[in-house]
Amino acid sequence: MGEARGQPGFAWGKIPKNPSLPPKKNLFYTFSTHTQQPSKFTPRLLPSNLLPSSSAPLLPLTPASLCTASEYKLIVPCAFLFRKRFGKNNVILSDIRKPPDDVFYNGPFIYSDILDYKNLREIVVNNRITWLFHYSALLSAVGEANVPLARAVNITGLHNILDIAAEHSLRLFVPSTIGAFGPTSPRNPTPDLCIQRPRTIYGVSKVHAELMGEYYHYRYGLDFRCLRYPGIISADSQPGGGTTDYAVQIFHDAIKNGQFQCNLKSDTRLPMMYIDDCLKATLAVMEAPAASLSMRTYNISAMSFSPEELVQEVKKHIPELQVTYNVDAVRQAIADSWPMNFDDSNARRDWGWKHDFDLSELVTTMFNILGSDSRVAQIN
């Protein structure tokens, strides 16, 4: 992915002052191409809305961010990156699950559920949040196995976030995915603007998120920003059942026993990206001046390859790797409906997107991280 994994939850934190940001009284950017002024957002009528305010709202000394997270693969590295850049105690990570030790002791951690609107709203208010990163979603194959849960997390959770972001004038980031396209979309390359028509609940919910975010931008002035992630490859997490997870599984299996069974056809080409590039792009689009954004949802890409091409690159490190293909019909049908290659020229032009990792560098990096005490180290 571009696919979020696991259960709903979130992370948040305070982001230090950026000299490119406007004065404190307006800590978010808005951008609109139409001539009408955005309408004022009317918040949900919770009991607290009916009570008079005792004082004017307080603005934070520096921007603050809240990240909803459904998985550790993306949100934990994102939180760690922000902590390194902005301070350990300025980013608070949260989930509905008990965190592992390395997450818990790395910085502040609290509990929250993306479906609990009142609790999320209290967190935004109590911590004076100004940036929000919304990652909660069930990924493609998992979502197909539990459509009601995917509908609740991916759509109802999004509605909670949109309302909170609009009410409190937040800068909102929502990741989208290659799964937002369908079999009638142009596949090679796939432009930012084209017919989508996905055939998974995950993809449908992501198109819904893109369009709702754009609607809230034009209707209420919400500073909505979205990136369509390709398949994301990381050494820091185990594969989680996604259609592109074969590209992570191959490294673990190659190191463990020198054998790999691929659940996609050998020539199935999909756009991919190393996680460091994914995090780099996410931070870059959030820091980009609003005036530089010509659209609200951008494709980003780094490389495109097939399982066979990945296998050949892996064999440069483990020549004796044995590969078999046992195609999973569900995952193959999903992959066949997705882009083969992303056109990300708008992101490169508008806010200077540039990837760092190609296929060779990705494979070498994965083995350097995973293989230091393994078969790779013995071979080398």
Identify the function of each model-found stretch.
Residues I114-V153, I164:
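NAD(P)H-binding glycine-rich loop region in Rossmannoid oxidoreductase-like domains
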Residues V103-Y105, V142-L149, P183-N188, Q238:
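Conserved catalytic-core motifs of eukaryotic protein kinase domains, centered on the activation segment
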Residues G2-A4, G9, I15-P23, S32-T35, ...:
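N-terminal Rossmann/SDR dinucleotide-binding element
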Residues R128, H134, A152, H159-I201:
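Conserved Rossmann-fold NAD(P)-dependent oxidoreductase catalytic core, especially the SDR/UDP-sugar
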Residues T68, S94, L132-S136, L172-I178, ...:
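SDR active-site strand-loop-helix element
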Residues Y72, N154, Y202, K206:
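Active-site YXXXK catalytic motif of short-chain dehydrogenase/reductase
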Residues L211-L270, I275-L279, L283-A284:
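NAD(P)-dependent short-chain dehydrogenase/reductase
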Residues N263-S266, L270-N380:
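C-terminal substrate-binding subdomain of Rossmann-fold SDR/epimerase-dehydratase oxidoreductases
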